Amino acid sequence: PPRSTLFPYTTLFRSLGFPVVGDWVVVERQGAAGAIAIHQVLPRQSQFVRQAAGTLTAGQVIAANVDTVFLMSGLDGDFNLRRIERYLVTAWDSGASPVLILNQADQFADLPAAIAQVETVAIAEPIHVISATQGDGLDQLTPYLSPGKTVVLIGSSGVGKSTLTNYLLGEQQAATQAVRLDDSRGRHTTTHRQLWPLPGGALLIDTPGLRELQLWSANTGLAETFGDIQALAADCKFRDCQHQGEPGCAVQAAIAVGELTASRLQSYQKLQREQQWIEQRQDTQARLNTKRRWKQMSKTIRQHQKRKR
């Protein structure tokens, strides 16, 4: 049957109600060896959601019921502080705890400099430097992989998610490919999301590389990721300070003395605007969805009344 008939929708955005990797579901087998039908998706403890690619206002759940999000970045051309900030916002919004993993340590000469840069954007999150191909530093990840815990790997193509998956599994299960040397871009070796049981009892979700990550939720992600800016803003002279030249702006004062970079403030303001924009789109879409449901309900009632006459 069509998937929309297998279980009831529980959200205003139907795409968020479909089962995804990591979901716990109520199922029924049709006969001794028949197909298994999903009747209900149980409430999620966490969900990593992005705005789906394209023009429609729709959330795409990447993984559900995750305890820890491993945000992987390569120490090559993939390394981008603004992308890391975006990943952190979405990870915090998911309800899980983000952990930054810097891969390809064996190919980078100045690791202390790279770590220092990341620490300017990852204020409170753990940072681990590893080499998935060499197996270096991977013992740092053991505390996150205790029995019953679920971890999802998030990152661009070619950052080493599948290589790390194979190492943690202890065998070659996920396909891997080399990164193009000319632009450090990876090839999509993982084409679908897959949940792997690890030998120690944890669950690992490997995901395809993300080419884009637009915000969807408006929870605590911005506050968690940019806590340094929000703390400075509390000392601004005006409560509605926009940090754009107003007198007594503590944020601009911090930039002037080198405590904060202008690029980090710009990133914060850009993500704020994006979040406000998607909230407006969601509100509009929610009203349209509600209108459609009432219209369909009215039509059903009229048809029922006609049949009774």
Question: Can you describe what each PLM-predicted range is?
Answer:
Residues 16-24, 29-32, 42-62, 97-98, ...:
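Helix-rich effector regions associated with P-loop NTPase G domains
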